[in-house]
């Protein structure tokens, strides 16, 4: 049976389903093909359920580490299985919302694996819609990414990726997390607050190595205080799953001495690579980059007419909100509607939802000076310890830091670590996107008392006149 659509979206993750909705809003007949996760990794086993677990962990942290601060008396126990059950319910609710949106926008759901026969035809295998042939005018590839692993390390029952970990309702007693990026550090926060003996091994010289160095220091201090062991500057050289226990060999960089940890479980979190295999992409003529991602232009167009790509498979910046933004550009381009390209992906915001939270975009001071050696770069940092709302919340760790051009006040980067940093960064993203200067940000009246006043104060600092510090 052959069906024809104006637009077919391959993959129902955050980029895929958003692009489908936008295309349908613009009058296109749209179908989405998905083999497993409607809402993608993000809604099912990533962003959404992990935030539920983190909230539970924050509550546990308050009762176990801050009892004296808040006058809490008596003993309270925390059940990880109950926290896990809540996270699955949260995920199910949000995924149900995706199906509702498909129906609301008259988008056809096709359940199965879409395989390209050629640049205008997809064949569905697996799933309840296996056997269908789908033709299209335009196709948006939103197939996401797959996890990397360490050389010589295979996933097994006790050596897992984030996906197996987040689906497991049982917390181990002792665990190693390989990789101190956002995912590794979020899981370390959750499990550490549920009494798991967690060790994080990171090859780079600090945790969250892609963030500002001072941000990394704040996070490292908070985690050590919480009892999480951090081993930055160490290489994981071998992982052996012995059934009842796992052995992890590691070496400090520059040393020949091998040490071994024996734990119940190991989670490997060392990044992702674009998912470009397993769906017949080679039958389309679509070109890949040297990194193995689908090559696109500013409008998400590939080199093949009528085929677009968005999200992790493009490797521009592998974040759900970036995929969503790309999806809207792709849909509007297909429909011939007015759109706005995304510009420099360096200026896209990112966050790590540990506690304190981390968020950033743009350049660090060092990066800015290296990129613009002839420009005077100014940096201002305002500590949350000087922010009244943060003091009232007893969440005074961290700071709001702004990197700017001294002459024009152009916003070149922002780096936040502290309470609700993921919410505070968006004001600065908007300002950067619309070319507001740091002076204009500082002159915008902010409600008192709020955490966002720290952002205003940092902007004042670029001009040399912070008020409350």
Swiss-Prot record:
Activity dependence on pH, as recorded = Optimum pH is 7.0-7.5 for the reduction of lipoate by NADH.
- Cofactor annotation comment: Binds 1 FAD per subunit.
Residues annotated as the enzyme's active site: 448
S-S bridge residues? 42-47
The reactions it catalyses are: N(6)-[(R)-dihydrolipoyl]-L-lysyl-[protein] + NAD(+) = N(6)-[(R)-lipoyl]-L-lysyl-[protein] + NADH + H(+)
Binding positions for NAD(+)? 179-183, 202, 269-272
Q: What is this protein called?
A: Dihydrolipoyl dehydrogenase
Q: Which residues bind FAD?
A: 34-42, 51, 114, 312, 320
Could you tell me the keywords of this UniProt record? Cytoplasm, Disulfide bond, FAD, Flavoprotein, NAD, Oxidoreductase, Redox-active center
Entry GO CC: cytoplasm
Tell me which species this is from: Corynebacterium glutamicum (strain ATCC 13032 / DSM 20300 / JCM 1318 / BCRC 11384 / CCUG 27702 / LMG 3730 / NBRC 12168 / NCIMB 10025 / NRRL B-2784 / 534)
Tell me the subunit arrangement.
Homodimer. Part of an unusual ODH/PDH supercomplex, consisting of AceE (E1), AceF (E2), and Lpd (E3) together with OdhA (E1+E2).
Is-annotated flag, keyword RNA-binding?
Answer: no
What biological process terms from GO does the record include?
A: 2-oxoglutarate metabolic process; tricarboxylic acid cycle
